[in-house]
Amino acid sequence: MSGLVTGRHYKTGRPVEVSLAGGVISAVTELPEHPSMAEWPWLAPGLIDVQVNGGWGLDLNTLPLTPDTVSALSRRLLERGVTGYCPTLITNGEPQLAQAASAIAAAVRRDAAAGAAVLGIHLEGPFLSPEDGPRGAHPKEHIRPPDWDAFLRWQEAAEGLIRIVTVSPEWPEAPDFISRCRAAGVIVSIGHTAATPEQIREAVAAGAAMSTHLGNGTHLILPRHPNYVWEQLAADELYGCMIADGQHLPPSLLKVILRTKQNRAILVSDAVSLSGMPAGAYRLHIGGEVVLTGEGRLHLAGSPGLLAGSTMMLPDQAAYLVRTGLARLDEALDYASVHPARLLGLDQAAGLAAGAPADLIRFRLNAGAFEGIECWKHGRKLPHGSGNGNGNSHVVGG
């Protein structure tokens, strides 16, 4: 596909004309300022989310998973500017995970939207901590030590699509498993862990490259030092993924993660099926009875202080960082596009520049929210959704 897209470059603020040809950006030309351009929207790379469990009532972890569910979720995400994502499967039994992985692979084979948007599967479990707190909502009966043979069976069911696996380094089997994953080109992320600092360092030495929703999936009370959060913050080798929805992490911790990780900071939605749904009472297969408030907070019905998942999609999380002064617009967008692309080894890491894939978003920033999001994938303009990032009107913070 070929064409021209105009807007303000998200890094410079200058008006530009982006030329698209053959699915890539062939040129980015800066234009002279003119009064008619004063209200031009912003142009930025398409967003990449490496942890998505569902949205708009579509759940990747309600089984049996169908390819149609994956395809529908892929279309919804593309419409809202998420041009690539990792469908995330959480802890379950071996046959259940194999079935879900197979359904995702089938969707990628059969459906254009899924084939374009799915970058690989994120397997979040079952190789996690069995301890309350770090385990989070993952079912304890399915938690198990890292098992390479089991992983290979899931990878076969996934037709090779598993790209990321979250592992707790507290298991004795973890270093060897991490080394095998690294050799196979699979990214290992540290998460849902009660590991000692020594075990964290050993995991990094074996090849772990990322932290899953850093600061969440922890004990309620940690030692001042040492502890597994500080150790991951201090590991320069690790990309730090964070949920910036105004609910999961306080601004002070988000600021610390952003300052320590810098060009290895990544925004993730960790969105569940209720993302984009109206406020009300719901029932989830994990968590049971839950309440979604008008502010986008999802909590257990009987325990308002306990979160039951994230409901804010990636565009809104980037806007939250800008609105609260935690990041500039260009920084927030890089956390949600360039940085995850670099982690995954994708050409999209070049950003909005000549030679990069023609995956773009164009939007307006109004009252601290991204509005009127338009999306191009492989140089083709896609239909867009309801105009904001997640289908809701939640504005948190600021």
Task: Annotate each predicted stretch with a short phrase.
Residues L123, C181, S211, L321, ...:
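Conserved, mostly hydrophobic/aromatic
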